[in-house]
Structure formats: C-alpha cells, structure tokens
Amino acid sequence: MTAPSQVLKIRRPDDWHVHLRDGDMLKTVVPYTSEIYGRAIVMPNLASPITTVDAAIAYRQRILDAVPAGHDFTPLMTCYLTDSLDADELERGFHEGVFTAAKLYPANATTNSSHGVTSVDAIMPVLERMEKLGMPLLVHGEVTHADVDIFDREARFIDTVMEPLRQRLTALKVVFEHITTKDAAQYVRDGNDYLAATITPQHLMFNRNDMLVGGIRPHLYCLPILKRNIHQQALRELVASGFTRAFLGTDSAPHSRHRKETSCGCAGCFNAPSALGSYAAVFEEMNALAHFEAFCSLNGPQFYGLPVNTGWVELVRDEQQIPENIALADDSLVPFLAGETVRWSVKK
C-alpha cells in the first residue's frame, strides 16, 4: 500500500471569484489572497458598484496598495452589469485591459446586488457586444422571484435564463459561477467550450444539513445556499472526474462577525485563509489528486485565454488549526472552518 503524499507541488493557482470588499476590510483580507494566488477575478459588487473604467482603475489601485511587499499578485477587474450600462464603456475597459470580464447579478440575488439586472433583454445590446469581443460573462445563476423556493433558484435559472441566453448568443463565453446543484453540474458538463463553472470549497465540503442540523451555523451561510447531499456529491464527482471546464473560485466573501452572528445575518464565507487546503482535502478524499493542479492552476487560464502562472506553491500534510477570529479595526472576522483542524496547508 502506497503511503499518502506529504507534499503537493502545483503551479501557482488563481482564484477566479473573490470578494475583496473595500476600506479597512480590504486591507485586512487582501493579503490572504495575494499570498497564495497569482491572479484573482475581483467581484464588482461594492456598495457603489464598479460600472465604469475609472472606478475599476481606482479600485484596482486600492487593492494593489493593500498587497504586502513580496507578494506577486494581479487583480483582474470586472464590470458590474446594470440595465443602463453603456456598451462603449465596457468595450473601452476591455480593450484597455482594465476589465477582464463582466458580472451579471440578477437584481437582489446576493450582497449589494440591488443595482443588478432586471432582465436579460434589458442588457442584450451589451451582451451582444461582449460576444463579439470574446469577453467572458460571469453569472450568478439564480432567479429571484418571490414565488421560487431558495433551494430551487439555480435549477430554475438554467431553464428560464441561462439556456435561452446561450441559445441566442451561441459564441458568448459564460462562467456559471459557484455552481451548487447536480442540475448545474450536468448542464456545464453537457455544454460546449463556451461554458465553464467555478466551484467553492464550502459547496464541495458541506451540504445543508451541516448548516442547519444541531443549530444554525451562520458562517456556512452563503448564496447560493448549501443544497442537499445529492447535489454536493454531484459537484464532488464533477471535479474528481478531471472535467477541464471547472475551476477554482472560492467566492471568499468576508463580513464582520456582528453582521454574520445576528438575527438577520449576511451571506458569505471568508474562506481565503484555508480554501486551497480545503480543495486539496476534497480531491484527496475523492482519490483525485491527479486532477488537483488542473482545477486550481490550469483550467481557468485555459478558459480565459491567459498564460499559466510561472511560480509554484507547495501544500504540506501538516495539521494546523484555523484561527477562531481575525481582528478588524472595530470588530472581528470569523474565517471559514474557524477553530477546526485542517490537514493540508500552504507552505510559507
């Protein structure tokens, strides 16, 4: 019997979906991402959404100012799509290398999404321009109608929004972000080379029982919400198969402790400190470590048409405890897996 590997050496990974926030929170959380990842697709859903080239340039600079010396990190900026967005502004940002992609939030689907798109028809001229440019569309794939159960939002989105959109714009590059259901896993698997998906560590590791049985665990509450076990298993099987159009996107989404542990708590898991080791544990459990590097470091660049990072990262089998909290200026931040022992960690 072969002894389990003690070290995993992979090309430096990228995070294809992260929330870095702004202000003091940004300064606190950026180093957890910039230390490990070469690049990250930065979500534009600030309190004032990133909808212009100038706003994206200014936000990118604030991120870079928060990157510690010695970290080689490139934030990849995204444009927040709204019903009134100017297609020329989007194209200018793409040509100038400011915008890597554009993000579609259905209105009120998640944090700071009230400015989001009310219907795909409202932004069709923008999407048609993106198709011509070869600019990726990043999609939070949930419908938000009041009559749709929260656990059914993703599956309904596929039928009513995603598939009709892709039938209309057959050459539009689409990333179905943070997929959570067997429906989405099958849909992406059956899709063509213009369709890819990101998957978070929490949706691979946990299901809704973990969040709700024996007490509500607010630090597992995120959107899209954790689903039942059969969906978790479908996601695990997708990544374990070596499917090349699925890649790492943590959806790391920090909120201060008092905004999570409250009667009406915010959605999001701050998983940046432990995400890479969490993914490694899942791939190991699935006997799929042969596909781990591709998921973390190769599949994303291939879909985006970007070069693979030149550096390397090592993970070591070394049990470490995740801190209970991380200090903020006037509060604290509870990380994903707080207080728990993890078996894979990034070698410093």
From Swiss-Prot:
Zn(2+) 1 binds at residues 17, 19, 103, 251. It comes from Salmonella schwarzengrund (strain CVM19633). The active site is at residue 251. Substrate binds at residues 19-21, 45, 140, 223, 255, 267. GO terms for biological process: 'de novo' pyrimidine nucleobase biosynthetic process; 'de novo' UMP biosynthetic process. Zn(2+) 2 binds at residues 103, 140, 178. It catalyses: (S)-dihydroorotate + H2O = N-carbamoyl-L-aspartate + H(+). Its cofactor is Zn(2+). Pathway: Pyrimidine metabolism; UMP biosynthesis via de novo pathway; (S)-dihydroorotate from bicarbonate: step 3/3. Coiled coil: none annotated. Belongs to the metallo-dependent hydrolases superfamily. DHOase family. Class II DHOase subfamily. This is Dihydroorotase.
